[in-house]
């Protein structure tokens, strides 16, 4: 299956990064390099791109796409939480801009072999790095009902979390839950018929929750953003695209803390805690895709872009 990357809010990202000729930019979720190639085109012959991804198939696709740019590109297999270590290994002391395009890619969702989607029956997996960490199959077959319910409730914001977890535990007693199709059917049975008639597919929230847990997406995000800000040069921009409220909340709160670090009580006449502002927030409200983009690419519908600048 071909890895096709349709970059979300491309023009908004390029403007948000405030690109300059000869600059060094990091795409922390390089994927198929849709954003990355556009950055290279806009930064001239001396511009550089460092692309990070933990999915080897994504990196292979990026490498194929970026062949014409030769030594201007460094592609690294890593988790974006290790951005500092990646730059250190490359001998890069600072960068001019950083992009995070969070969540799962269309390729990962659409490729049955990756086991992400409830729409295609396949072996349950959901790992962005298919060689590391427990898969979703392992989680649903080993965690207690309480542990599963907490994941589904916290990461999926699913009102029927405890009922779904109970059904999963009961069903796996008969035989291990191995496929996306069987898991989706179990979830569908767990949710009352009246609730199933409302909103999106009944398995959507649970699948999202399991994917987030498998890949530690929210667990590492805040730290990754702080690490990214540390390696930005003054005036450098960080752009973050999120796709659900949990991600966006973390980005918003992390930016707020970095922009207003004072922890002194409000009644203090002056700051004595020594907190130092690291960024200024460029987007008071998140940027969202245009109606035209959503029509062309429905998966962009929930995207939000937040931008900050290093002081």
UniProtKB/Swiss-Prot annotation:
Its EC number is 2.1.1.199. It is found in: Cytoplasm. GO terms for biological process: rRNA base methylation. It catalyses: cytidine(1402) in 16S rRNA + S-adenosyl-L-methionine = N(4)-methylcytidine(1402) in 16S rRNA + S-adenosyl-L-homocysteine + H(+). GO terms for cellular component: cytoplasm. Keywords: Cytoplasm, Methyltransferase, rRNA processing, S-adenosyl-L-methionine, Transferase. InterPro entries: RsmH, SAM-dep_MeTrfase_MraW_recog, SAM-dependent_MTases_sf. S-adenosyl-L-methionine binds at residues 33-35, 53, 80, 101, 108. SUPFAM superfamilies: Putative methyltransferase TM0872, insert domain, S-adenosyl-L-methionine-dependent methyltransferases. It holds the Pfam family Methyltransf_5. It comes from the Bacteria. GO terms for molecular function: rRNA (cytosine-N4-)-methyltransferase activity. PANTHER family: 12S RRNA N4-METHYLCYTIDINE METHYLTRANSFERASE (PTHR11265:SF0), S-ADENOSYL-METHYLTRANSFERASE MRAW (PTHR11265). HAMAP family: 16SrRNA_methyltr_H. Specifically methylates the N4 position of cytidine in position 1402 (C1402) of 16S rRNA. Belongs to the methyltransferase superfamily. RsmH family. This is Ribosomal RNA small subunit methyltransferase H. It comes from Pelotomaculum thermopropionicum (strain DSM 13744 / JCM 10971 / SI).
């Amino acid at each position: 299956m071909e890895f096709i990357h349709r970059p979300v809010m491309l023009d908004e990202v390029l403007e948000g990064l405030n690109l300059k000729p000869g600059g060094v930019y990091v795409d922390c979720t390089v994927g198929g390099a849709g954003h990355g190639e556009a950055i290279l085109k806009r930064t001239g012959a001396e511009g550089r791109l460092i692309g990070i991804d933990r999915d080897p198939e994504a990196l292979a696709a990026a490498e194929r796409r970026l062949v014409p740019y030769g030594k201007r590109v460094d592609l690294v297999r890593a988790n974006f939480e290790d951005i500092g270590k990646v730059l250190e290994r490359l001998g890069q002391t600072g960068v001019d801009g950083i992009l995070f395009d969070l969540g799962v890619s269309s390729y990962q969702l659409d490729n049955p072999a990756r086991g992400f989607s409830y729409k295609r029956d396949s072996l349950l997996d959901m790992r962005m790095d298919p060689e590391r960490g427990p898969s979703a199959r392992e989680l649903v077959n080993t965690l207690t009902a309480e542990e599963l319910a907490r994941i589904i409730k916290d990461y999926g914001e699913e009102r029927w979390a405890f009922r779904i977890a109970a059904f999963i535990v009961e069903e796996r007693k008969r035989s291990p839950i191995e496929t996306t199709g069987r898991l989706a059917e179990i979830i569908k049975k767990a949710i009352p018929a009246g609730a199933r008639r409302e909103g999106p597919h009944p398995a959507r929230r649970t699948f999202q929750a399991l994917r987030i847990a498998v890949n530690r997406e929210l667990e590492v995000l805040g730290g990754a953003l702080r690490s990214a800000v540390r390696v930005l040069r003054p005036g450098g921009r960080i752009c973050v695209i999120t796709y659900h409220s949990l991600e966006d909340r973390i980005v918003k709160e992390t930016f707020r803390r970095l922009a207003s670090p004072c922890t002194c009580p409000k009644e203090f006449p002056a700051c004595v805690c020594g907190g130092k502002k690291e960024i200024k927030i460029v987007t008071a409200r998140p940027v969202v895709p245009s109606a035209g983009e959503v029509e062309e690419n429905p998966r962009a519908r929930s995207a939000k872009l937040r931008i900050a600048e290093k002081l």
